[in-house]
Amino acid sequence: VMDVVIAGAAETDEIGVLPGHSTMRLHVEGARNAVADAGLRMTDIDGIASVSAPGPIQVADALGVRPRWIDGTGVGGTSFLLHVRHAVEAIRAGHAATVLVTHGESGKSRVGAARGAFPASSPNAQFEVPYGVTGPPSMFTIPLLRYMKEFGLTAEQLASVAVAQRKWAARNPRARYRDPITVEDVLASRMISYPLHLLECCLVTDGGGALVITSAERARDLPRPPVHILGTGETFESPLISQMADFTTSAAFRRSSAEAFAEAGITHGDVDHLMIYDAFAHVPIYGLEDLGFLPRGEAGAFIAEGHTEPGGRLPMNTNGGGLSYTHTGMYGMFLIQESVRQLRGQAAAQVPGAEISVVQGNGGMFMAAGTLVLSNRRA
């Protein structure tokens, strides 16, 4: 099987609040940075993957690329993990040689941003919004409350997720928030949607990034150390929160991660570094359990005991995560960027000797899941 790698990776020059940057400008800036990082030119790109709006064709046109393969898969924040998976398949099939995956989002400033509300004709708008499920915070609290009741997760354990990730952010000069926080600080912050406090909810920022994906053979001539894509997974559940099979676990997380681990041929003990989407503080708890790192009901205590923070035995969300680093609305691109930095040995808060990193994303609440197993060595 052809070895496919990430040969270039970069974010926009700035992330945070960028009122002078449109969504398209963020796409273009991240794309140019990633192509330069790979030591390539735009003329070397023959595949584009991007979430609309603006979409892959519009992004390609803005970059002066005439692709022979595109992917516009849009399933929320995990879309970029699926783009990587699809790019691997396209390169192996000969549909493209070098694929550029782009992201740009004016999540805070809303410059050129698409409307984010549920369309009136959608099942969500018809069957859930009338009962108070009006957006991500109120959607996510439904499974969280059930999990807390069933497994005894405490408010303090939930708050410890934000505390752990702020410790990583304190080591990252690009992180939006770096000041230390305590469990008490989290619980004293404003209630957003019970039981989630402000500091347990993701940031709302502007920014973007891009990835260059190609064969390992081609990457031999490029300047950056390649990051090998050992395994990928994707799967889906209902977009309706009410239709989850079990509020205390994500079936999509379980299936996508099992597929990626099997393809990569790794065990949980092989994993040195972990990035789990954290739009809200409980998602990494679900991730640790649904990916099989811990038995159900134990992840809250595991995080509260410090095992995922600097110096812990399972470093997780080492850029500070969506809770402290950045979160433009669709955060998955930034998960991958941090894994690439770790595997290149270039991270602000570097995990010593990291060789295998697992990236887990979700989209549309727990509707969609994508998993990547990445490494700085071949399988």
What function would you assign to each model-found segment?
Residues 42-51, 70-71, 99-104, 156-164, ...:
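Beta-strand segments within the central parallel beta-sheet cores of soluble alpha/beta enzyme folds
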Residues 49-102, 106-139, 177-203, 234-239, ...:
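Conserved catalytic cysteine-centered active-site region
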Residues 18-19, 110-116, 170-174, 240-242, ...:
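Short acidic, glycine/serine/threonine-rich loops at helix termini
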Residues 75-105, 137-171, 211-217, 326-347:
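Active-site-proximal alpha-helical scaffold in enzymes
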Residues 1-78, 86, 147-154, 176-182, ...:
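Conserved active-site "lid/cap" helical segment
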Residues 1-24, 160, 191-255, 305-319, ...:
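Condensing-enzyme catalytic core mediating Claisen C-C bond formation in acyl metabolism
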Residues 250-254, 258-281, 290-293, 323-328:
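Extended C-terminal subregions enriched in glycine
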Residues 55-63, 241-246, 278-301, 312, ...:
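Short glycine/threonine-rich loop-to-helix capping motif typified by GTGT followed
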